[in-house]
Design a protein with these regions (language model features):
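Conserved N-terminal beta1-alpha1 strand-loop-helix module at the mouth
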Residues: 1-104, 108-111, 116-142, 158-161, ...
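A short acidic, helix-capping loop that chelates divalent metal ions and anchors anionic groups
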Residues: 94, 150-155
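Residue-level signal for pocket-adjacent positions within structured domains
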Residues: 153, 200-201
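Strongly charged, low-complexity linkers/loops
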Residues: 167-168, 180
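Glycine-rich beta-strand-to-loop/alpha-helix junction loops that act as flexible
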Residues: 179-183, 201-203
């Protein structure tokens, strides 16, 4: 199986790395993965976004074998389109499926440990505070997904950290900051102005009637071209 191109950890490569990190991250859930049309939607998302989009395979209830089989299917679309497949939390699946990246959370191994175990993978980290971000960056994360920025259904009643949080992280760290949490296309310009490299969404893509069109909406709001 062809391995994805490694991203150099050296600081003088920051500019080129920043350009290669996708600007739209479409994050899944167990319920989304179980939909009968999930793989078809993945294909539409990846073709619409090309290398500017990443599909995050995030699941809590499935076995490693199930996720591995699913990831291998999605990795084939990655090769066709240049779009990224990123596995959340499960380093074993990321290592063996042909995924391009690994997204770490507070429950995962540290970024530094992941880099030693999987030097060819691009590694990001999910953060919820400035301290989280500092630890992730010092451990070698190549990007951070930060939130939640706006109120979401999964955090109902909890005030979002706001655009200012993204701006603070972007000013403190020379790696891409990806904003997550209730982000709609109309929020993208403001987040980008604050310093966000891109955005991560769940409902905005996977619950849209046309997932491919939703991708184009987000990319257009960012000012980036789509895929194929």
């Amino acid at each position: 199986m062809e391995q994805p191109e490694a991203l150099s950890p050296t600081t003088n490569a920051t500019a080129s790395i920043d350009q290669r990190i996708p600007i739209l991250h479409a994050v899944t859930s167990d319920d989304i993965i179980l939909r009968s049309d999930f793989t078809d939607r993945v294909r539409r998302v990846k073709h619409a976004g090309g290398p500017r989009v990443a599909v995050h395979l995030r699941a809590a209830r499935f076995s490693a074998r199930y996720l591995f089989d699913l990831a291998c299917q999605i990795a084939e679309v990655q090769t066709e389109t240049g779009a990224w497949l990123i596995i959340n939390d499960r380093a074993d699946v990321a290592l063996t499926s042909g995924a391009r990246g690994l997204q770490l959370t507070s429950r995962s191994m540290a970024p530094a440990d992941a880099r030693r175990s999987a030097p060819h993978l691009a590694i990001g980290a999910s953060v919820h505070s400035t301290d989280d971000a500092a630890r992730a960056v010092s451990g070698g994360a190549r990007w951070i997904v930060a939130g939640h920025v706006f109120e979401t259904e999964s955090h109902a009643g909890e005030k979002g950290r706001g655009t200012e949080f993204i701006g603070q992280l972007a000013s403190e760290h020379a790696i891409p900051v990806i904003a997550i949490g209730g982000v709609r296309p109309e929020h993208v310009a403001g987040l980008r102005a604050a310093g966000a490299h891109g955005v991560a969404v769940i409902r905005g893509v996977w619950y849209a009637s046309d997932a491919g069109a939703a991708v184009i909406d987000y990319l257009s709001a960012h000012g980036a071209p789509g895929g194929q």
